[in-house]
């Protein structure tokens, strides 16, 4: 199958988001689609798969004009889109998820479970993976759930597969498994559109790259004919000389202390963070990093241990108490835990600090609006105004709104869990710069990251976790990818 998108444009009201886009996808090819968040990548793919119509231009499939009315019609034609937030039902089994809305029935109108099992097993065999069809999706790893989504696309004679940030939440082993599956699909003649910000992956598995910026296609070229610096320059319209901006914060007295913390998924965790310091937390998925931070913030219960801020012992049983004590927590899942997607930017940013805008029993909207405007400008949130619905923003701008929410409480300590996950290269640097500015103001920052180059480039010290314990804490001058991974995998 050959897809040609010709002169595609799209406007939402007066806002033009795509202009004169040309894109060609061939069978048996892995085609990277790159660009900053808000460049128009997802909009272009949503037009291709029929989620909404183009304002102009045309789509040809094997030289015939084609317009899909909805994603289901596109899937029936062999074009599947696996979104970053997967479309699965956690309480249903693998088999039920695979055939939801496409159940096979016998001539009596009764579900033909045997036929569905046979078809499901064949799909997984083609992928080279084994998954229990009777297991609930919610009990699978993210990598396994992704394989279910790919298997689902096999049920409709897959010809083109679109993947949006597919490795964002995968372990290293699951990522390698995915790359193996992609290679197999490519050999079977499936065309793959691969949306990612991860340069290493792009150069490892793709054949060609299309770069978008501000709703335009900047360039399309063979992967082997370009390099990281050139791609970054095309994506952001400028050269990023210091990918990790220099940090000038003075590291002073200890502000935050965790002493012998233990809970269900971790034990005997002790560490401290100083004023102006960025303490990184590294480790493999499942090591317990997020669980430690959730307990500190009062989401999960501690079994033992003490938490101190400025030498004062704290009792934190819920997030409201944590916020009252000056702890901010940007969670790893911004869409489910960090934001109310149907609320405005203003409503989201003021959520944890609403009481500060209550005067004589009434909400002071004017003061809140000024407050939000100042924060949005400081973080360079790209939006029409503070009333724009957060769900309509790009991933990078959504992340900035979550950051603004916690900066707005003037935190005594700020916890950031995967702060740049799913964020483009330009927005990443803005987040790093913001972290440096907060550190310069004396805010201690705890940052969890699964991106080793990032944590090495940003953190002053790195605590490495392995199987629920801190395996070691490394100073910046002794931290390398090799010794971090050695500690993370149980080495000494």
Swiss-Prot record:
GO terms for molecular function: ABC-type D-ribose transporter activity; ATP binding; ATP hydrolysis activity. One of its GO terms (cellular component) is plasma membrane. Keywords: ATP-binding, Cell membrane, Membrane, Nucleotide-binding, Repeat, Sugar transport, Translocase, Transport. It comes from the Bacteria. InterPro entries: AAA+_ATPase, ABC_carbohydrate_import_ATPase, ABC_transporter-like_ATP-bd, ABC_transporter-like_CS, P-loop_NTPase. It is found in: Cell membrane. PROSITE patterns: ABC_TRANSPORTER_1 (PS00211), ABC_TRANSPORTER_2 (PS50893), RBSA (PS51254). The keyword Ion transport does not apply. Its main location: membrane. SMART domains: AAA. ATP binds at residues 35-42. Residues 3-239, 249-492 form the ABC transporter domain. Its EC number is 7.5.2.7. It catalyses: D-ribose(out) + ATP + H2O = D-ribose(in) + ADP + phosphate + H(+). It is a peripheral membrane protein. It is an enzyme of class 7 (translocase). CDD domains: ABC_Carb_Monos_I, ABC_Carb_Monos_II. It holds the Pfam family ABC_tran. The keyword Coiled coil does not apply. Belongs to the ABC transporter superfamily. Ribose importer (TC 3.A.1.2.1) family. The complex is composed of an ATP-binding protein (RbsA), two transmembrane proteins (RbsC) and a solute-binding protein (RbsB). Part of the ABC transporter complex RbsABC involved in ribose import. Responsible for energy coupling to the transport system. PANTHER family: CARBOHYDRATE TRANSPORT ATP-BINDING PROTEIN MG119-RELATED, D-ALLOSE IMPORT ATP-BINDING PROTEIN ALSA-RELATED. This is Ribose import ATP-binding protein RbsA. It comes from Lactococcus lactis subsp. lactis (strain IL1403). The lineage of its organism: Bacteria, Bacillati, Bacillota, Bacilli, Lactobacillales.
């Amino acid at each position: 199958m050959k897809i040609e998108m010709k002169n595609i444009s799209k406007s939402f009201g007066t806002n033009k988001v795509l202009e004169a886009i040309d894109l060609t996808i061939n069978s048996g090819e892995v085609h990277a689609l790159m660009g900053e968040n808000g460049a128009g990548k997802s909009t272009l793919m949503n037009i291709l798969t029929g989620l909404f119509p183009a304002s102009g231009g045309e789509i040809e499939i094997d030289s015939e004009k084609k317009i899909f009315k909805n994603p289901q019609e596109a899937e029936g034609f062999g074009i599947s889109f696996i979104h970053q937030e997967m479309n699965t039902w956690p309480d249903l089994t693998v088999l039920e998820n695979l055939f939801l809305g496409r159940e096979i029935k016998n001539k009596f109108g009764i579900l033909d479970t045997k036929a569905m099992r046979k078809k499901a097993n064949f799909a997984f065999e083609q992928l080279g993976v084994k998954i229990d069809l009777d297991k609930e999706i919610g009990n699978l790893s993210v990598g396994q759930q992704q394989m279910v989504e790919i298997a689902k696309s096999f049920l409709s004679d897959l010809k083109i597969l679109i993947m949006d940030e597919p490795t964002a939440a995968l372990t290293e082993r699951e990522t390698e498994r995915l790359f193996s599956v992609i290679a197999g699909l490519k050999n079977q003649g499936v065309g793959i559109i691969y949306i990612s910000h991860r340069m290493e992956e792009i150069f490892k598995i793709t054949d060609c790259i299309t770069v978008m910026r501000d709703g335009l296609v900047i360039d399309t070229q063979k992967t082997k004919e370009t390099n990281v610096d050139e791609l970054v320059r095309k994506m952001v319209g400028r050269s990023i000389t210091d990918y990790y901006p220099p940090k000038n914060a003075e590291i002073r007295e200890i502000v935050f202390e965790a002493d012998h913390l233990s809970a269900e998924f971790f034990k005997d965790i002790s560490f401290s963070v100083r004023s102006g310091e960025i303490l990184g937390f590294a480790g493999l998925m499942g090591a317990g990093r997020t669980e430690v931070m959730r307990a500190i913030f009062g989401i999960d219960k501690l079994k033992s241990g003490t938490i101190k801020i400025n030498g004062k012992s704290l009792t934190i049983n819920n997030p409201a108490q944590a916020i009252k004590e000056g702890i901010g927590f940007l969670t790893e899942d911004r869409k489910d835990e960090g934001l109310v997607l149907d609320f405005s930017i203003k409503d989201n940013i003021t959520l944890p600090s609403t009481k500060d805008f209550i005067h004589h029993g009434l909400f002071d909207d004017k003061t809140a609006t000024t407050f939000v405007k100042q924060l949005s400008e400081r973080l360079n949130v790209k939006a029409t105004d503070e009333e724009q619905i957060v769900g309509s923003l790009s991933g990078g701008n959504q992340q900035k709104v979550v950051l603004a929410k916690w900066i707005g409480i003037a935190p005594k300590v700020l916890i950031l869990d995967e702060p740049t996950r799913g964020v483009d290269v330009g927005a990443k640097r803005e987040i790093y710069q913001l972290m440096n500015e907060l550190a310069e103001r004396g805010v201690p920052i705890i940052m969890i990251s699964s991106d080793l180059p990032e944590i090495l480039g940003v953190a002053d010290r790195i605590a490495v976790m392995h199987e629920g314990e801190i395996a070691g804490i490394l100073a910046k001058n002794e931290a390398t990818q090799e010794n971090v991974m050695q500690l993370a995998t149980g080495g000494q």
